[in-house]
Amino acid sequence: MVHGWDGNPKNAWFPWLKKELEKNGFVVFTPLMPKPEEPKIDKWVNYLKEDVGVPDKDTYFVGHSIGCQTILRYLERVETPVGGCVFVAGFFNLPNLETEEEKEIAKPWLSLPIDFEKVKRCTNKIVAIFSDDDPDVPIEDKELFEKHLNAKTIVEHNKGHFSDDAGITELPSALNTLLDISK
């Protein structure tokens, strides 16, 4: 499970999902990504590579926000088949960044292309979960996940950015999706 920008593995619904997955027999890794307040593609992808080791068809990924981007960029580099991915508040656009610093940090994540064909060769089980009132991720990105990744998409209501600020401490849709795609 890969947390988001300025996040950590103890944020929001991460502890709950980890516990629920472990109850269902999953071995769950929730690394604290390097310098979460200033995520860099190469640092995060390389860190994930070290943490995961050699993935296989029984490896599943869950990402939140920029953690989704990290997983996509990881998969395009390793090109190894995995079980599937659940992306929560994943994005390709961030139109509401407020500061120049935020825009500078986000720029490479938004401008460097992802090889979607390589990602799709790794798995055909991709589910992306969005909220209809996310202040950061435009709901239109749902269509981009469907188009570029053949992702199944779920739209939750009133979940904001699925963060502590939105008060989201449990996320049954992520759990149920992961249990479903891992059958």
Give each language-model segment a name:
Residues M1-K57:
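Active-site catalytic motif of lipid deacylating hydrolases and related acyltransferases
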Residues G4, M33-P36, V86-N96:
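Active-site nucleophile loop of the alpha/beta-hydrolase fold
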Residues Y60, G83-V86:
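Residue in the alpha/beta-hydrolase core beta-strand immediately N-terminal to the catalytic nucleophile
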Residues F61-I71:
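Gly/Ala-rich beta-loop-alpha elbow adjacent to hydrolase catalytic centers
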Residues E100-K118:
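Active-site nucleophile elbow and catalytic-triad environment of alpha/beta-hydrolase enzymes
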Residues C122-T123, V127-F130, D134:
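Short beta-strand/loop motif that positions the catalytic acidic residue
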Residues P135-D141:
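Conserved alpha/beta-hydrolase "acid-adjacent" motif
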Residues A151-K183:
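C-terminal catalytic histidine-bearing segment of alpha/beta-hydrolase fold enzymes
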